[in-house]
């Protein structure tokens, strides 16, 4: 009688290879690198314990609850091919451990404490399976892909964007001028850089006003709906909401948020506001590489992408496969599908550890940006398909003739690639030829092709 005090082996309680996972469990795949001498079963069980009900010693209050009902369970361990010291530990968490509709709580539970654990040399969360029973407690993206196309009246092609550069230092009026020139030239969107908030050289309200003026002028002249991602990110959630409200009063179609630096709680509040008030929400992933770049420690971006779809956002940056920032093709396409599709089959070659069923949650448009230019257009059109936003910052504003011709060059290149694809041509093989043909009737594109013909972002 009573309880047996003392330190216990985690694997005795939390390593349960016979466990059959339930449809309502949240499943996690962790890449575990145990300290030398720690068996994988003990390390896997330690992860399950520390990210659910466990603590380092037996406590008498364990007797006041049903551990079997609430504990996380490490139900499978497999070696990582080519890595002697690493294992994939699969952990199942009962749904009752999590607050409904809170990405914040989900992450605090699953990754909050366990990453500093002494028995582990390194730990990486590779994937999460979110059951419909949990995902249904989230609103998800404010509008989603189809509603966005209907709002913008743009179909059958990727959308084109451009980040205004230099990202810091322009006055609000000059900033608005650059926005106007890009939109007038043929882009669908322009974008505040992620670190443009409200600095001494350009306060947020001035920027919002000049950008709204720019996009209305461009709309009137082109007959197309235009948008500028007004960055509402701020030092407090209240200030962020104030900026979003002002954007809505200006009648603009879209605002923006840095969801990792701003935090999931703020992001979810903003997403709810955006749905209630007809604003689209563009999400930038500033700070993601701090979390996801190491191969053996941190959180893979596909998990951050899933979390964003639950928290809410209509666009999110997803790497390029071809530009200046890292991204392996198959893995990138894996999380692009996780953002856009309703149902994604388990496929380890693309890094997808679990079959994910989003049921009817709206999709998110992946945004390709970072060091891309007109010569990349065929590859981007083929890799990302129609449901994407292609963002050329330097690839627009770096045009030798100026911003508007830079925008024209990108729009012509995109239309040429979409037309070629619709005619059944193979963009992977004939892409350069398609662009060259298009230069014949677009001097702007010809000039862009000349400037960027030699650029490569490859570091061997």
From Swiss-Prot:
GO cellular component: chloroplast
Residue positions where N6,N6,N6-trimethyllysine is found in the record: 4
GO biological processes: photorespiration; reductive pentose-phosphate cycle
Pfam families: RuBisCO_large (PF00016), RuBisCO_large_N (PF02788)
Assigned keywords, A-Z: Calvin cycle, Carbon dioxide fixation, Chloroplast, Lyase, Magnesium, Metal-binding, Methylation, Monooxygenase, Oxidoreductase, Photorespiration, Photosynthesis, Plastid
Known catalytic reactions: 2 (2R)-3-phosphoglycerate + 2 H(+) = D-ribulose 1,5-bisphosphate + CO2 + H2O; D-ribulose 1,5-bisphosphate + O2 = 2-phosphoglycolate + (2R)-3-phosphoglycerate + 2 H(+)
List of residues binding Mg(2+): 191, 193-194
InterPro entries: RuBisCO, RuBisCo_large_chain_AS, RuBisCO_lsu_C, RuBisCO_lsu_C_sf, RuBisCO_lsu_fd_N, RuBisCO_lsu_N_sf, RuBisCO_lsuI
Protein's cellular compartments: Plastid, Chloroplast
Record: active site: 165, 284
Chain positions of site Transition state stabilizer: 324
Subunit record text: Heterohexadecamer of 8 large chains and 8 small chains.
HAMAP family cross-referenced by the UniProt entry: RuBisCO_L_type1
Function of the protein: RuBisCO catalyzes two reactions: the carboxylation of D-ribulose 1,5-bisphosphate, the primary event in carbon dioxide fixation, as well as the oxidative fragmentation of the pentose substrate in the photorespiration process. Both reactions occur simultaneously and in competition at the same active site.
Protein name, per record: Ribulose bisphosphate carboxylase large chain
Gene that this polypeptide is encoded by: rbcL
């Amino acid at each position: 009688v009573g309880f047996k005090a003392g330190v216990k082996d985690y694997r005795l309680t939390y390593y349960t290879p016979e466990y059959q996972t339930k449809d309502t469990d949240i499943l996690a795949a962790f890449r575990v690198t145990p300290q030398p001498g720690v068996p994988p079963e003990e390390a896997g069980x330690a992860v399950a314990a520390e990210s659910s009900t466990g603590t380092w010693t037996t406590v008498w209050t364990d007797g006041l609850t049903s551990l079997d009902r609430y504990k996380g369970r490490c139900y499978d361990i497999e070696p990582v091919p080519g890595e002697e010291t690493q294992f994939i530990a699969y952990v199942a968490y009962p749904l009752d451990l999590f607050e409904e509709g809170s990405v914040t709580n989900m992450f605090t539970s699953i990754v909050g404490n366990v990453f500093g654990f002494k028995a582990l040399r390194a730990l990486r969360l590779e994937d999460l399976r979110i059951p419909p029973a949990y995902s249904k407690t989230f609103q998800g993206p404010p509008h989603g892909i189809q509603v966005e196309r209907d709002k913008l009246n743009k179909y059958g092609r990727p959308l084109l964007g451009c980040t205004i550069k230099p990202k810091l230092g322009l006055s609000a009026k000059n900033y608005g001028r650059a926005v106007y020139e890009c939109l007038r030239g043929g882009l669908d969107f322009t974008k505040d850089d992620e670190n443009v908030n409200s600095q001494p050289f350009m306060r947020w309200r001035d920027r919002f006003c000049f950008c709204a003026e720019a996009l209305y002028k461009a709309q009137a002249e082109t007959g197309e709906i235009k948008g500028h991602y007004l960055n509402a990110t701020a030092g407090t959630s209240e200030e962020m909401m104030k900026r979003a409200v002002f954007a809505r009063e200006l009648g603009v179609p879209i605002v923006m948020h840095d969801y990792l630096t701003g935090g999931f709680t703020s992001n979810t509040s903003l997403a709810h506001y955006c749905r209630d008030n007809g604003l689209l929400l563009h999400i930038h992933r500033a700070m993601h590489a701090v979390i996801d770049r190491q191969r053996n420690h941190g959180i893979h971006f596909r998990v951050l992408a899933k979390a964003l779809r639950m928290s809410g956002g209509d666009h999110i940056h997803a790497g390029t496969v071809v530009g200046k920032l890292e991204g392996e093709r198959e893995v990138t396409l894996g999380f692009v599908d996780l953002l856009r599709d309703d149902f994604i089959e388990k496929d380890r070659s693309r890094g997808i550890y679990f079959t994910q069923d989003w049921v009817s949650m709206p999709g998110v448009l992946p945004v390709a940006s970072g060091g891309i230019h007109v010569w990349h257009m065929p590859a981007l059109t083929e890799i990302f398909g129609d449901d994407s936003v292609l963002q050329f910052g330097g690839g627009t504003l770096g045009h030798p003739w100026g911003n508007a011709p830079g925008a024209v060059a990108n729009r012509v290149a995109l239309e040429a690639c979409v037309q070629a694809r619709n005619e059944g041509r193979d963009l992977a093989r004939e892409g350069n030829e398609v662009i060259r043909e298009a230069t014949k009737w677009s001097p702007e594109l010809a000039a862009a092709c000349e400037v960027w013909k030699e650029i490569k972002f490859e570091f061997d």
